[in-house]
Amino acid sequence: MRQRDAVRQIACSVLFMLLIGAAAAQAAGTDVADAARRGDRDAVRAALARKADVNAAQIDGSTALHWAAERDDLEMADQLIRAGARVTARTREGVTPLQLAATNGSASMIDRLLKAGADPNAPLTAGGDTALMMAARTGKTDALRVLVEAGGNVNAKETWGGTTALMWAVSEGHVDAAKLLIGAGADVSARSNYVAAANGRGFEGRTPVASRTDPKTEEFASGWLTPLTLAAREGDVEMARILVNAGADVNAVAGDGKTALALAIFNGNYDVASLLVDSKADVNKADAQRFTPLFYAVDRRNMETAPNFPWMVTADPMPLIRKMLDAGANPNALVNNTPRARMREGSPRIVFATALMRAAFAADLDLVKLLLERGADPKILSRDNETMLSAAAGLAFIHGYHRGKPPEERLQVVKLFVELGNDVNWHDDYGITPLMAAANYGSVPIIQYLIDAGADLSAHDLGKKNDGAFGSSNEPLMPIDYAIGVGTFVPNNAVIIHQDAVDLMAKYMKERGIAHTTSECTLRGFSCSQVKVDPKVATPGEIVRARKFATGHQIEGLTGGLEAK
């Protein structure tokens, strides 16, 4: 046993000494790289005089020439190249001196490396990025010119996203770089790779597919971008003008079907959109979700404000809307969909039939009048048979979330649609009436107007608008229930009580002998707890305080009409 331990100790000692020796040899062998890393030209010169290996790499694979390129030290680079430095050397991550020079946008360093044998078209990353692409990102035209004159391919695509050097210049807003590339023959209508919705970026192991040439698009797909769509997305008017003048296709569509015009409007870049309309962009081209440029402009005029959308506070697309209508935009183009951004933010479904319905939902009186003047049909129904009146009255409107005009203006919009023939007692496919929509919104003057116009206080919905979600129930509800908050459209079961609206409707129901038939259990939010509340005499506040919430489903034992135990 002792002999075995002694042998093991000797072996460990020998191994340790070998490692120390190897480390010392490594340190001694990287004198040139170490000196270059420090930027010490004298030390580099001295090491080379001692015949130190000019290509010896540090532990990460960096050579002296890498450090010279990184530091943009031309004198040191010349010295190393004369001593035989390999310009194609790669670090362990695959980085070459040319990649570092291109990232810096150093024309002189790029020129030195190219003359020493570097390939201007070599893929410098695993994704196939070239020096021209990297230089384009810096915007330094002298660096680009050196690469182009050395034979750099201006239309080469990196292999992951399929982008070109021109796309990189456009995305970064480098106008002069874009001009140089276009002058050198860059394709202004080149496309990036198409990314199917099921193969979207951000999912592990999934990458864009090869660029497509067929016109098929799909909802929620991405990619398939052109330099012009990138300029539209970034809001770069000058860049967009350069590309249009160079012959870019103004109607090319991205993977989700958006044209540059739609993409500009979607991002609030109305100056670019105006330029594209002037350039004969198709103002009626719908994307894969059926949204037209006109709809996006109407939506953005009244879109929910968020910190990451500062332009929503200041920019007004109304002049653009007028320009698109003048250019032939169809105000009756059927959309029958909900904007994706609204769905992703947790807002309930509200299906907009046309741009007019979106304007009605926001109670944007000026915009509603403009669209009507230009031929918008006030009687078009959504796919759920919802009317313009219901949208204007407050269908699915969430206070504190949705952006709309003041109640006084909303009342004027409601009156307008009633005068145009919208039925005050129309039931949509969920049984919801305009009065229920108004009760959800909670404006007493609007409710009063609809009651005076003949709205039915005894109406019942079909109990299926939310399928038990959002704090609602599956029991048919009355208009007053929407004011109480039972028919809420608010996510996370938040309760919004409109006490004045409840009082007004209760008064009329009492005068007209209309019974409030909704069960106690439903009024208390699915929960038949030990707390007893008589919904026929209790105030809405007392009812709500007694509510116990079930999130997204019914409490066990409560089914169908949610009858109270």
Place the predicted regions along the sequence by residue.
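Bacterial N-terminal signal peptides
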Residues: 11-22
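N-terminal segments that cap or nucleate solenoid repeat domains
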Residues: 26-67
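Ankyrin-repeat boundary/"N-cap" motif
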Residues: 28-34, 57-63, 90-96, 123-130, ...
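Ankyrin repeat domain, specifically the short helix-to-loop turn at the C-terminus of the second helix
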Residues: 48-53, 78-86, 111-119, 145-153, ...
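Leucine-rich solenoid repeat scaffolds
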Residues: 468-527
